[in-house]
Amino acid sequence: MKPEELTKRFRTELYRDRLQVLARIELRRAGLLQHKMSASDVVQDALVQALARLPQFRGNTDPEFYGWLRAILANKLADAARHYGRKKRDAALEKSFRQCLDESARNFEDLIAADQTSPSQHVLRHERARRLADALDALPSEQRVAVEDHHLAGYSVAETAKRMDRSSAAVAGLLRRGLKTLRENLEGREREPG
């Protein structure tokens, strides 16, 4: 295996946690979580496909690579939606997943840091992303849904409340507790070695 291909394989794994958060948000947005769907399964399928297609990737930067991975994930999510709903290929559905994934990804990136250019800063950014994904996974389910829908998917408190079949006050409480727990978890993880 060529060194550049090994590097691309490693880069693929760096994005696994972020892709799982994004997939979970999109599966919930599309109403697919009630099916026997798992974000980790969809991401695993997307990464297997990405590894098989590594020679086809022509970009040079991490943002290009991350965008390429999100495009593959969007296609996998559209496949899942077709499997559990409409059976025909739907370009609008794939485009919708891609746009929503891109918006959620921007919100996720905004949470972890500003622009960073040095190699060490780049590694720190990936580490922060992994820690944020882990901290989100550690939240109680309803707090995680509220935080992801409001802060990453961009829904208002009222929209999040409607999606969760809760009152706005209840969702505000979930957000408050979720963010407090998330902050505590992240501070604890910052003190832990790698």
Regions found by a protein language model. Name each.
Residues 2-14, 21-45, 60, 168-169, ...:
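Short, charged helix-capping/linker segments at alpha-helix termini
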Residues 25, 56, 74-103, 125, ...:
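Arg/Lys-rich amphipathic alpha helix in sigma70-family domain 2
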Residues 26, 136, 150-151:
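Short helix-to-turn junction characteristic of helix-turn-helix DNA-binding domains
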Residues 31, 54-63, 88:
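Short alpha-helix-to-loop micro-motif enriched in aromatics/charged/Gly
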Residues 37-48, 63-75:
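Structural recognition of an alpha-helix C-terminal capping motif at a helix-to-coil junction
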Residues 99-134:
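Acidic, proline/glycine-rich intrinsically disordered inter-domain spacer in sigma factors
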Residues 126, 136-144:
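Short helix-coil-helix linker/hinge
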